[in-house]
């Protein structure tokens, strides 16, 4: 007879833990609008980290690079190679866009894997990595969509829309639908992976000693980096595809 109360208590504990998964949003009221303050705060932190580290590393550029300058030159070379591989010979103007996407997502993801934002106590709501919020990932995906439309129209003019009836006009609905599925897949893939990783870290830190979650955190760092690479690679591939034609 004691099985039922025990099961109910177990379910209650699991339900309480699942509350971390849903979370509480931290809002600012600006005029008549509710703003997701947790996204703005953590995004500002990420931007400050990127700008601060870049400024410190290259404030005194040397002919023979120092450690910091050498690291950022390596990152730039990596992003240039990625852009050239996916976009082609006309990759140059798109390096800043692809680089910004990659670095912002990479540092945002790592902040979620290294910093248990949700444990930070606030009067109400909670903090989370920027990419833990669906609004951020959707915004990044929409920026990518705008970028590849702009790239295609700039290269081909109105002839860009001819891709929708290739190789046959019968595929017009599917080709149009593809433009909606691209940002959806980009945004939900990034959001789902980062949310799951951050929740695992938060739950383990809450339930077990701090040493135990370390392997999970290292795995989170790896997957976070992979997700940033996937997003940047797909963004560059979409831009390259829009400039070259429909494949």
Swiss-Prot record:
Short name of any one Pfam family annotated for the protein: ATP-synt_A
Membrane topology: Multi-pass membrane protein
InterPro entries named in the record: ATP_syn_F0_a_bact/chloroplast, ATP_synth_F0_asu, ATP_synth_F0_asu_AS, F0_ATP_A_sf
Localization per record: Plastid, Chloroplast thylakoid membrane
Family named by the database record: Belongs to the ATPase A chain family.
PANTHER family: ATP SYNTHASE SUBUNIT A, CHLOROPLASTIC
This protein's name: ATP synthase subunit a, chloroplastic
